[in-house]
Amino acid sequence: MSYALLRPFLFNMDPEHAHEMTLSLLDKAHKARVLGLVYGQSMQPTDCMGLQFSNPVGLAAGLDKNGDYIDALAELGFGFIEVGTVTPKPQVGNDRPRLFRLKQADAIINRMGFNNEGVDYLIENVKRCKYKGNIGINIGKNAATPVEQAADDYVYCLERVYPHASYITVNISSPNTKNLRDLQSGEALTHLLDAIKNRHSQLATEYGFYVPLVLKVAPDLDPLQVDYISQQLLDFEIDGLIATNTTLSRVGVEDLPDGDQAGGLSGRPVSHISTQILQQFSDQLDGKVALIGVGGIDSGAKAVKKIEAGADMVQLYSGLIYKGPGLVQSCIQSIGGYYDAMEN
């Protein structure tokens, strides 16, 4: 069944239940060995952060929080998969309802709150999967951990996931964990990166191989914050930046049903602001840090906009919900066409 036929049925369901059902259906199709026949794999080889990717279009964190569906999702043609956000201990997240569709705007508001089964559960899934591509693991802190002790949670997760991840993303930008975004500023960011980078260097020595470190930031940053974060990335030799997470802004959706729900807004309305922030980081970092663009990509043209703004690679999430799995190949082909045109 095509996604266009399935979507009306899914969109009449509770969003979180529909999310779970979609992943279950994908898993069944994967086990029946039909997904690869339908979607295949487009090649657009990309080198980034010292890693080789089959193509520059990845899955953003949040869709497969626990790594339960890596093999099924990989068959949609992604060049890399990011799982998580995962925390040291399992946690249920915020109360339901916590996921809302804004259909008129092709948008989603979520206040999930890092619901996950804990880092050890995720690691077992990563170890068990057959996918041979790059897997990023996105780490966060437990809601019960005071923000002043956040570094302890991040370092704990870093230690656990290090031998199993292709790269590790430090998520300090979710709006749904109290005070988490405070870690994006001032001494809090410096202290966090110092603790993470010190342990990261030790782990690289202990294991004898290097796993790139990535920071994921919010779109709700002013120019001074962009400048400060950029300098911290350079000072601590962080390998990559994901721009961006969801926004607290409600511009363009404030009058829509559920447009005033608390949480982070993703999808089409965040496209412009996230691309602006990406461009600002690109200007500041001047190619010294790898950039992954995410936010509002619902077409191949939008993916190219991220590349034009300085992204080395892109990630999808909300666009998949509204446009379906065919969006992956569309983005790969559009980015490939863009690079071909640049060379001619």
Swiss-Prot record:
Q: What class of enzyme is it?
A: oxidoreductase
List, from the UniProt record, the residues annotated as the active site of this protein. Answer: 174
According to the UniProt entry, its GO molecular function terms are: dihydroorotate dehydrogenase (quinone) activity
As cofactor, the record names: FMN
Note on how the cofactor is bound: Binds 1 FMN per subunit.
Write down the membrane topology.
Peripheral membrane protein
What keywords tag this UniProt record? Cell membrane, Flavoprotein, FMN, Membrane, Oxidoreductase, Pyrimidine biosynthesis
Q: Give GO terms for biological process.
A: 'de novo' pyrimidine nucleobase biosynthetic process; 'de novo' UMP biosynthetic process
Q: Where in the cell is it found?
A: Cell membrane
Give the matching SUPFAM superfamilies.
FMN-linked oxidoreductases
Family stated for the protein in its record: Belongs to the dihydroorotate dehydrogenase family. Type 2 subfamily.
Q: Quaternary state and partners of this protein?
A: Monomer.
What's the stated role of this polypeptide? Catalyzes the conversion of dihydroorotate to orotate with quinone as electron acceptor.
Under what name is this protein listed? Dihydroorotate dehydrogenase (quinone)
Q: What organism does the UniProt record list as the source?
A: Psychrobacter arcticus (strain DSM 17307 / VKM B-2377 / 273-4)
What are the leading ranks of the lineage? Bacteria, Pseudomonadati, Pseudomonadota, Gammaproteobacteria, Moraxellales
Q: Which gene encodes it?
A: pyrD
